[in-house]
Amino acid sequence: MSGLYDAFQRRLHVTGTLVTETGLHIGAATDGLDPTAVDNAVVRLPDGRPYIPGSSLKGVLRSFMERLQNSPGHWLVSPGAPPSECLHNESRKDLVKQFKRQRRSERELAEFVWDHLCPVCRLFGSQEFAGRVLVADLMPLEDRVLLERRHSVAIDRDTRTAAGGALFDLEVVAPGTRFALSILVENPSDAQVRDLMVVLLALSNGEIALGAKTASGLGRVRLVDARIADYGARDVLAAAWGGARPSYSLAEYVRLLGLEAEEPRVSREALQAALAALGPEVTWQQAQAVLREVFGGERGA
């Protein structure tokens, strides 16, 4: 069973720039008496510039992948609830007691837990298993970042008028702000890489929103200039001696995904032709359709 972290086998490093297309608000905890301070401030660095917590981006990427993986009879969003296949926390507690009574090893328990996790938990992690995806905090690329203050008012659902005392300010990062993106994926399988690339394609097409008030149009972001380095232990050693690790653009890497499949259902030429027919502007829906046809709808392993 190759799901556990026995040894370093493969690492995926995704870099790029995340650009805000509309105002972005990721809130910070505020507790002050300054009457001039904004009611809902954005999270900031010590130097006052806003940043995007890696956990915030990881959360929306995971949520998007859950929606892609969901299908009738295979619902992943409610772990442990039928017909979900994912092991939930209470089941794990019972399993620990059972395995101890049977004097079974921790290794056996870990393998059992792995075998009963859904594809999303295997990639992004859960209470039972450390995730493979590591998203660093996204730092602003500009020395000075423009922030906007927007005035809002809550609406009473019954009267459809402004609720009393419900006027508040919302601080947002201005559109066009750039943040440096860095994602590491440790020991992913080929299927997990394909699933993650579909999610990144959606992010590059501006189809994933981030932060608060997304229903009101805030939080639209887009991944640009993405590069993917896919390397193993030998590549790490080669880099230590001055060698270069292979790196691809997102579009290039999507076209190469099927070439390392364990059991491709089409020839290399047919796969290249199918992906080339998509053109330079590949959407995640198109890529997902081709990859599912090639790999028979395989879900993340």
Which stretches of residues belong to each language-model region?
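RNA-binding basic/glycine-rich loop and surface signature characteristic of RAMP-family CRISPR effectors
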Residues: 1-154, 158-301
